[in-house]
Amino acid sequence: MMSSKQDEKIILGQINGIYGVQGWVKIFSHTDPRQNILSYSPWLVKVKNEWRTFQVEEGRAQQGGKSVVAKLEGIDDRDLAREYIGCEIAILPEQLPATEEGFYWMQLIGCQVTSVEGEDLGQVTEIVETGAHDVLRVEKQSDAGLVSTLIPFVMETFILDVDVESKQIQVDWQLEDATES
């Protein structure tokens, strides 16, 4: 089943504990740095397979930025806060600020990759951080099984065009024929 744009959510973290007696919660954040999760409000919190909206009233980094605590609107005591432990925290894509590149890495997952010659190379399944240049893992089913190709994400050298709206990436890359010697 295709999900509509309205159904898309970006998971930023999870509530993983309670803090104090006034309803504050501890957050495991996937953002970098961790406290960047506090830049977004409202949060969508998944409670028993249902997304609920919460405004972030206050928040701060703890232990030198290693953990984050937040006070959410409507959660005013320790017992109520405890009910949210384990719940995912998400935002809607439109809450993200614009980027210089015009896209986020997560938007590349699922994009169809084609070479300048028009060859279908497969779909982006992962972005691998290598230090020098991040790398797209592109996978395609073939007669020989699943073919995985790694393409360095270097704009204008290997990556010629990225269109996240149509989920298309054009690359200057050729698959090597495994039968050639």
Curated annotation (Swiss-Prot):
Record-level Gene Ontology MF annotations: ribosome binding
Q: Does the keyword Amino-acid biosynthesis apply?
A: no
User: Which cellular compartments is it found in?
Assistant: Cytoplasm
Per the UniProt record, one Pfam family is RimM
* Biological process terms in GO annotation: ribosomal small subunit biogenesis; rRNA processing
The chain positions of domain PRC barrel read: 100-177
The alphabetized UniProt keywords are:
Chaperone, Cytoplasm, Ribosome biogenesis, rRNA processing
Task: Tell me the superkingdom of the source.
Answer: Bacteria
The signal peptide annotation in the UniProt record is none
Q: Name one GO cellular component term.
A: cytoplasm
**Entry keyword annotation includes Chaperone:** yes
Q: Please give the InterPro entries that the UniProt record associates with this protein.
A: PRC_barrel-like_sf, PRC_RimM, RimM, RimM_N, RimM_N_sf, Transl_B-barrel_sf
- Main localization is cytoplasm
Can you quote the domain comment? Answer: The PRC barrel domain binds ribosomal protein uS19.
Family assignment?
Belongs to the RimM family.
Known partners and oligomeric status = Binds ribosomal protein uS19.
Primary role: An accessory protein needed during the final step in the assembly of 30S ribosomal subunit, possibly for assembly of the head region. Essential for efficient processing of 16S rRNA. May be needed both before and after RbfA during the maturation of 16S rRNA. It has affinity for free ribosomal 30S subunits but not for 70S ribosomes.
Q: Which NCBIfam families match?
A: 16S_RimM (TIGR02273)
Q: What is this protein called?
A: Ribosome maturation factor RimM
